[in-house]
Amino acid sequence: MTRLLPGLLPAIVLLVPFGVAQPFRFPTANHSLYEKGGGEKFLVGTPGKPWTTGAFGCVRTDGWQMHEGLDIRCLQRDRQGEPIDPVMATADGTVAYVNRQPGLSNYGNYIILRHQVDGLEIYSLYAHLSQVGPGLAVGQRVKGGDTIGRMGRTSNTRQRITKDRAHVHLEYDLVINERFDEWHKRHAPGQRNDHGMWNGKNLLGIDPRWLYLAEAEHGARFNLLQFMRSQTELCRVMVRETRFPWLRRYGSLVQRNPVAEREGIAGYEVSLNFNGVPFNLIPRAASEMKSG
């Protein structure tokens, strides 16, 4: 996928009519991503750093730290300068998780919604909220555009989010393992996990910016499954297992292989993007798997 700064978007993206129905909306009224040179108005960076440190990718600590979302800048404030932007569901879905105890996570108050789009399960996460919508509960259905909370500055990090950096942290994630809590107890004994399978360590993010730009470019022809399958490949791994959680949850990412169908599946060849997201899985027969 070609990497372009928001200020250098192709004209086709900038001219897309906003009335076209698309699966994913922005979580706030800030749509500056689509403006020429709008990156600085759309994202807020870390203290003393440019706005690009609020983007997705290895943008923190001089490129050594991964940031798995977008920090979308505040547009509305009260008389005390606190953010009051309504935060909205980006697509139709179901509430998967709500955390109303900001001291338990560096996400602060956060919400996770589950979406089914084009045959793929994907999750949106909204963090640092000052308020979660009253009555919002796990299992509740929401529509894209419904207000689910209010932008804030909540977090449990040592360095607090200042008023000038107020933002909503947005992620689009895939879940690694529904038994994450069991794994965590075995591999991190003594360490707390207050959020079960909704711990951020169990979520693999895709870049929301490129999702929105792909939507703008393709309009009604945008397809989330095709978007996922077109991720840039960093590497491939051979998995000598035929049953693992990713297969059950993301079977739509499995590519047919006549040889494995005929001889039997011995494992999977898995393509990973730069954030380690498995976006293409090819079943392999024993005759196709190299020994090593």
What are these regions (language model features)?
Residues 69-73, 87, 127-129, 148-151, ...:
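Long, contiguous hydrophobic alpha-helical segments, chiefly transmembrane helices and signal peptides
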Residues 105-106, 110-114, 140-218:
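Conserved, short, structured surface segments that act as functional micro-motifs
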Residues 20-109, 194-292:
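Surface-exposed, glycine-biased beta-strand/turn segments
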Residues 74-76, 100, 115-117, 128-130, ...:
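A mature extracytoplasmic/lumenal domain signature
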Residues 7-17:
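Bacterial N-terminal signal peptides
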Residues 76, 99, 133, 146, ...:
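Sec/Tat-exported extracytoplasmic proteins
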Residues 1-4:
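Positively charged n-region of N-terminal signal peptides that target proteins for export
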Residues 82-84, 90-135, 161-167:
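Zn2+-dependent peptidoglycan hydrolase active-site motif and core
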